[in-house]
Amino acid sequence: MDFDFRLLIVLLPILAAAGWAVFNIGVVAMQQFQKFLNK
């Protein structure tokens, strides 16, 4: 089975952007949650 590396080249930036967005949302959500707990 021959893997098409063009597919990887297309998907990699999309996956990187999605991962970065999820990471940032997670960080903000944790900060909000900690503020909520500290009230």
From Swiss-Prot:
Superkingdom: Bacteria
Keywords, in A-Z order: Membrane, Photosynthesis, Photosystem II, Thylakoid, Transmembrane, Transmembrane helix
One GO cellular component, as annotated: photosystem II
Pfam families, alphabetized: PsbY
GO biological process: photosynthesis
GO MF term list: manganese ion binding
Membrane topology: Single-pass membrane protein
Keyword Transferase: no
Localization per record: Cellular thylakoid membrane
Main location, first listed in the record: membrane
Subunit structure: PSII is composed of 1 copy each of membrane proteins PsbA, PsbB, PsbC, PsbD, PsbE, PsbF, PsbH, PsbI, PsbJ, PsbK, PsbL, PsbM, PsbT, PsbX, PsbY, PsbZ, Psb30/Ycf12, peripheral proteins PsbO, CyanoQ (PsbQ), PsbU, PsbV and a large number of cofactors. It forms dimeric complexes.
Protein family: Belongs to the PsbY family.
UniProt cross-references to HAMAP family, sorted A to Z: PSII_PsbY
Purpose of the protein: Loosely associated component of the core of photosystem II (PSII), it is not always seen in crystals. PSII is a light-driven water plastoquinone oxidoreductase, using light energy to abstract electrons from H(2)O, generating a proton gradient subsequently used for ATP formation.
UniProt protein name: Photosystem II reaction center protein Y
UniProt organism field: Trichodesmium erythraeum (strain IMS101)
Lineage: Bacteria, Bacillati, Cyanobacteriota, Cyanophyceae, Oscillatoriophycideae
Gene of this entry: psbY
